[in-house]
Amino acid sequence: MTIVHVITIDGPTASGKGTVAHKVADAVGYHLLDSGALYRLVALASDRIGVDIEDVDGLAKTASRLDVKFGPDRVWLSGEEVSLAIRAEAIGNRASAIAVHQPVRDALTKLQRDFRKLPGLVADGRDMGTVIFPDAQLKVFLTASVEARARRRYKQLIDKGISANIEDLLRDLEARDARDRNRAAAPLRPAEDAKLLDTSDMTVDQAVAQVLEWFAAVRKA
């Protein structure tokens, strides 16, 4: 049986996991799964049709019917490019609230696992190594101080032309961290066999180099 290698990169909001995952995928020539984008797509789609964030059945149905397409740095929902729309802070907060519901997570599980194709996959999210790909060849858990993450998120938003307030971002991150850690469905935590990487004082390239070093060691084993 052909083994399709998977690298999982999990961590809290704005820990740098998305950027690191993208660069690692480019370096090794693997497919990329941005699982957070899927939850943001559910948030956007459900918001547009008026589904309340506590309507679990409605949210799960929305998740199961997602018509999505991913391209380099772009994403489409039902044929409409929504790359910028899903990155709005309001959609991010809604996605975090929606992600606590197990039926929504269940609806997205198969969709996420379908990304596992040759030559391999780099998957970033919050439960990639613990729930979606527990047999991944390399599991990485990225973290950083909440202050460092707030600064990064602020820069990301400003660079994209989205207005932001760093104090508001700090409060939002703290609230999301608490919600992610304490939810009953797939709480945010490192897999037991994950490599821990604190990126508070690291550049993106340094973090990428460390992940690639770990993966090279895994492939030699």
UniProtKB/Swiss-Prot annotation:
GO cellular component, one term: cytosol
Compartment(s): Cytoplasm
Pfam family, one: Cytidylate_kin
GO molecular function, one term: dCMP kinase activity
This enzyme's EC code(s): 2.7.4.25
Principal subcellular localisation of the protein: cytoplasm
Keyword DNA-binding on entry: no
Organism superkingdom: Bacteria
Record's keyword annotation contains Iron-sulfur: no
Protein's name in the database: Cytidylate kinase
Taxonomic lineage from the root: Bacteria, Pseudomonadati, Pseudomonadota, Betaproteobacteria, Burkholderiales
Protein's gene: cmk
